[in-house]
Amino acid sequence: MGLSIGGELDAARRAYEWLAGLQLQDGSWWASYRGQEIDNANRRESNFVAYIATGVWHHYLISADRHFLHTMWPTVDKAIGFVLSLQSEHGEIDWAVDGSGKAKGDALVTGCSSIFKSLECAHNIAVTLGEDRAHWLTARDRLGKALRHKPERFDRTWESKSRYSMDWFYPVLAGVYTGAGARLRLASRWDEFVEDKLGCR
């Protein structure tokens, strides 16, 4: 995304093509790579996988390269399919699967907020290309409701991560909260996380 912003559109396109080439059959990627080699085969994280949609849509908005969008569509489609396979009946999406593909059994507020934005971008891609993926918006709506109204579905197996600023601001950044709700959320912990003239901790 930085390459796209910086005007290095060919380099950005090649980076996305590299990702597409490494995508696994189920639509996911391993947590990290070094070149063509897998650097971490212990897990595959849902918010990382979903974010391909945000990156592809971002590049298209900058480049207006419809051929790029069409070429990347199968990659995005498979990635979102993998991510939504991890959504529970309550709406949250599991943060990862282990090396054997078993869901880890918990969800992250920040990770799910990122997925919320990625589902919006993925659906924008689908609409632009004339593909029907209305169920992605349904899944996004369920995820948003879980983030806003079901805090018990997150941080079930570890200490709450609400002590970190990203759990506070990311649901606003990703559009889970908007308008007055977003302002109220930011105001509620502003003094806890924001250092005057320095930034957010």
What feature does the model see in each segment?
Residues 1-88, 112, 116:
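Aromatic-rich carbohydrate-recognition surfaces in CAZymes
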Residues 29-42, 93-107:
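Acidic/His metal-coordination segments adjacent to aromatic residues that form catalytic metal sites
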Residues 2, 35, 66, 98, ...:
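A near-ubiquitous, low-amplitude feature marking generic local secondary-structure context
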Residues 71-74, 78-80, 84-95, 102-117, ...:
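Extended ligand-binding clefts on enzyme/binding-domain cores
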